[in-house]
């Protein structure tokens, strides 16, 4: 019959525990990594960092009057300033195009970008309202006096949306245009169309519906003298009106090729507008 000697069993357990414990100690001594998860860190979202960066530019810029173009928007505008997509490896945004065209102080196209990823219409409105009225006052500086303000806003309000969606977006754009003109009355506001998404239903029910209303908006007497509509939608669709996916990273945000197409259209517009003004 099989039996266990109590002394031998206890001795074996003690030896095993010592060996395992010693091995564990050695492993711990050899590799004791410091994990980020064990360190206290304040959470900072991208939009918070962008607000700080925008305020720093406004505070530290030696000559805000050098800014000729102002870009206002959400992530689609914000990502002009990204090279690599920080969330998806291998995707490129518009930084190279931006640096080539809009980042040179002293040039006629030197630009300041206040687009922030994730912003809805109401968030942009809060940022451009003066501090005296409870906003962030990002346009408060009298030195900031751009020649053109490029605006693309509203697509984020198509998610978790108020109903009717197109009405909500239209009213939000309207409020932002009025606020922009109140802050910078000498600027020509360029109201850009929403870009196509990869959702056919959203394009039909929201994007094209909003674009049609924005096109009509700039012809109203209130806006006619200082606002122009720039239709980018056809540049990003094929002959059937479907989004050209090769110009986008994810069906919503342009890739570097998409930003190049956008840039080229803006330069064409600027050349035409300045020529007309001179004549």
Listing of model-derived features with the role each one plays in the protein:
Residues 68-73, 110-115, 147-153, 188-193, ...:
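Structural recognition of the beta-strand scaffold that forms the well-ordered cores
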Residues 106, 179-187, 216-228:
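A structural motif corresponding to the C-terminal end of an alpha-helix
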Residues 78-86, 118-170, 174, 179, ...:
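Oxyanion-hole/transition-state-stabilizing segment in secreted/luminal serine hydrolases
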